From Swiss-Prot:
Belongs to the DEAD box helicase family. DDX47/RRP3 subfamily. ATP-dependent rRNA helicase required for pre-ribosomal RNA processing. Involved in the maturation of the 35S-pre-rRNA and to its cleavage to mature 18S rRNA. It comes from Candida glabrata (strain ATCC 2001 / BCRC 20586 / JCM 3761 / NBRC 0622 / NRRL Y-65 / CBS 138). It catalyses: ATP + H2O = ADP + phosphate + H(+). The Q motif is unique to and characteristic of the DEAD box family of RNA helicases and controls ATP binding and hydrolysis. InterPro entries: DDX47/Rrp3_DEADc, DEAD/DEAH_box_helicase_dom, DEAD_box_RNA_helicase, Helicase_ATP-bd, Helicase_C-like, P-loop_NTPase, RNA-helicase_DEAD-box_CS, RNA_helicase_DEAD_Q_motif. One of its GO terms (biological process) is maturation of SSU-rRNA from tricistronic rRNA transcript (SSU-rRNA, 5.8S rRNA, LSU-rRNA). Residues 104-276 form the Helicase ATP-binding domain. This is ATP-dependent rRNA helicase RRP3. A motif (DEAD box) lies at residues 223-226. Residues 26-68, 467-493 are annotated as: Disordered. Residues 307-453 form the Helicase C-terminal domain. CDD domains: DEADc_DDX47, SF2_C_DEAD.
């Protein structure tokens, strides 16, 4: 998208200077805000704020007592093999997180485990460490299989196993949809120790790849189990569970919540599991600052660019509800000289992996994504999450903002709220058990950016429309050629 938008900027001399104008206005605005008193700016902004009904939190609401805290000062206290302890040190893992402290000891003792913890709590290492510790004692192929709901999460889990097993000679492979089946079959024939897979593609290989079997599987992990079931993987999971052995198999189930579906799944697949719950309700980590910004109609793009100016030098994920918005905003950011890349479901697997790699490597500071990126992706350096579109359910909000403030780090999320989003925000606040504070801004200052942002957005929309027409024309051309070939075939007969 960056390259394509770059061509647009050359078409218009006016647009090429928009970024410079916005930067200059932003600097001027910052000086004005520093000169203005806080009291004045608050009174200016409060005149235009949208009134929102406050929800009272019931005083008699039942609160579950937290379990007694389990802590370890280092990974060495868990009695891991030296190679694993050294790998943790190399990764700057100073001490186990709460879910790791709860889940690793019973897992090392051989128990099935149910891990319930909020997003960003270090769940992946909580099951990877005990598996690798056991693998060191008994190395054999197809030792463990991890099931994940998305291709991106599966790749992240593979990277965690590779990092933690870097001193142990561990072989891993990632088996997901959207990639070549034959290449994956060759990877499986190399006898990896750990297989990380999405359920559908794993089932394809179990049924169609000669010589591949999980009859000697020792560990099965179902990560983000609530999402696995939400995405209708239930029937495939049932088929997989019937194929793989139950005797001699240890099973770990990790989820953000304990629903009735998950309870049914754990009864079907786990034996006398140890439940390790760090949090029994949806919540966000303490190091995350969550705010909202009330946006008048038609100004969401302008407010977004204002925020990106404020956060120059930081890494930002912008979440949208649609693929078109993700593409458009990525183009808008690039046209205005913010380095951005898009991640959404219309991209093929190589494009999605490429976008993530650019962001993780710091070659792009902004990732504009649909909810495909909201769950499970471990990108440690995300500073800011911006909800350009408010998610329609509270779970999605929790998982979006959980992309920042991970594993003890601090972070911030800002939600851009229009008058049509108030009901959605009230639901989110009810789940969080608190009201989200409003960002105090001078809307008159933000409005100075409006003309430049609107002009740039118009250029991006025109370019997207042009590309869509070209794509449709190519599609018609292909269909025409296919129909002509079919007619020729009929005539020959």
């Amino acid at each position: 998208m960056a390259g394509k938008v770059g061509k647009v900027s050359k078409k218009s001399d006016d647009v090429s200077s928009l970024a410079a104008k916005i930067r200059a206005r932003a600097l001027e605005n910052q000086k004005k805000m520093q000169a203005a008193s806080r009291k004045d700016s608050e009174s200016d902004s409060s005149d235009e704020e949208v009134e929102r009904p406050a929800k009272k939190q019931a005083k008699d609401e039942k609160v579950e007592e937290p379990e007694e805290e389990v802590t370890f000062e280092s990974f060495a206290q868990l009695n891991l093999v030296p190679e694993l302890i050294q790998a943790c040190q190399n990764l700057n893992f100073t001490k186990p997180t709460p879910i790791q402290a709860r889940a690793i000891p019973p897992a090392l003792a051989g128990s099935d485990v149910i891990g319930l913890a909020q997003t960003g709590s270090g769940k992946t290492a909580a099951f990877a460490i005990p598996i690798l510790n056991k693998l060191w004692e008994d190395q054999q192929p197809y030792y463990a299989c991890v099931l994940a709901p998305t291709r991106e999460l599966a790749q992240q889990i593979k990277e965690t196993f590779d990092s933690l097993g870097s001193l142990m000679g561990v072989r891993t492979t990632c088996i997901v949809g959207g990639m070549n089946m034959m290449d994956q079959a060759r990877d499986l024939m190399r006898k990896p120790h750990i297989i990380i897979a999405t359920p559908g593609r794993l089932m394809d290989h179990l049924e169609n790849t000669k010589g591949f079997s999980l009859k000697n599987l020792k560990f099965l992990v179902m990560d983000e189990a609530d999402r696995l079931l939400d995405m209708e993987f239930g029937p495939v999971l049932d088929r997989i569970l019937k194929i793989i052995p139950t005797k001699g198999r240890t099973t770990y189930l990790f989820s953000a919540t304990m629903t009735s579906k998950i309870d049914k799944l754990q009864r079907a697949s786990l034996t006398n599991p140890v439940k390790c719950a760090v949090s029994n309700k949806y919540q966000t980590v303490d190091t995350l600052v969550q705010t909202l910004m009330v946006v008048p109609g038609g100004l969401k793009n302008t407010f977004l660019i204002y925020l990106l100016n404020e956060f120059i030098g930081k890494t930002v994920i912008i979440f949208t509800r649609t693929k078109a918005n993700a593409e458009r905003l990525s183009g808008l950011c690039n046209l205005l000289e913010f380095s951005a890349t898009a991640l959404h479901g219309d991209l093929n697997q190589n494009q999605r992996t490429g976008a993530l790699d650019l962001f993780k490597a710091g070659k792009r500071s902004i990732l504009v994504a649909t909810d495909v990126a909201a769950r499970g992706l471990d990108i440690p350096s995300v500073d800011i999450v911006i909800n350009y579109d408010i998610p329609v359910d509270s779970k999605s909000y929790i998982h979006r903002v959980g992309r920042t403030a991970r594993a003890g780090r601090s972070g911030k999320s800002i939600s851009l709220v229009s008058q049509y989003d108030l009901e959605l925000i009230l639901r989110i606040e009810e789940v969080l058990g608190k009201k989200l504070p409003k960002e105090s801004v001078d809307k008159n200052i933000i409005l100075t950016l409006r003309d430049s942002v609107d002009k740039a957005n118009g250029e991006v929309v025109m370019e997207m429309n042009r590309r869509n027409k070209e794509k449709q024309a190519r599609g018609k051309g292909r269909r025409g050629r296919m129909m002509a070939k079919e007619n020729m075939d009929r005539e020959e007969k």
